[in-house]
Design a protein with these regions (language model features):
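C-terminal tail/sorting-segment detector
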Residues: 2-8, 89-112
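Glycine-centered coil/turn sites that cap beta-strands in beta-rich domains
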Residues: 6-29, 33-53, 63, 75-78
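Surface-exposed loop/edge segments in extracytoplasmic proteins
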Residues: 59-65
Length: 112
């Protein structure tokens, strides 16, 4: 997980980026993907949050992040591997963002 932007300052002196007003889980890019999708998400306040990947049958494949997050703009990449490090097959997968105040699931497609 990487924090994309300092929520208070831009790289340009004197320019400020406001904190997000609400939770947002964006569609991964690229989609379809091969080999690595990037998942962007926004968090309006400091909170514990997780992002997990599920197969089309609902089986949890891997947890990408499960930790305390600062408010701001974040992203995480998935290497298309399961929790044991095995490469997963092509197909439909779902990623789910979950915090105390927000749950959102989106679909992505892995091409092999």
């Amino acid at each position: 997980m990487e924090r994309v932007l300092d929520p208070q300052k831009n790289k340009e002196p004197g320019k400020y980026i406001p904190l997000p007003e609400k939770f947002i889980l964006k569609q991964n890019r690229p989609n379809p993907f091969n080999p690595t999708p990037r998942i962007h998400y926004r968090i309006p306040k400091d909170t514990q949050a997780s992002i997990a990947i599920f197969d089309e049958k609902g089986k949890k494949i891997v947890v990408l992040v499960d930790q305390e997050h600062e408010a701001g703009y974040h992203h995480v990449d998935w290497n298309a591997r399961d929790r044991s490090g095995n490469v997963v097959s092509g197909g439909v997968y779902f990623y789910q963002f979950q915090s105390k105040d927000y749950v959102k699931t989106r679909k992505m497609i892995l091409l092999r």
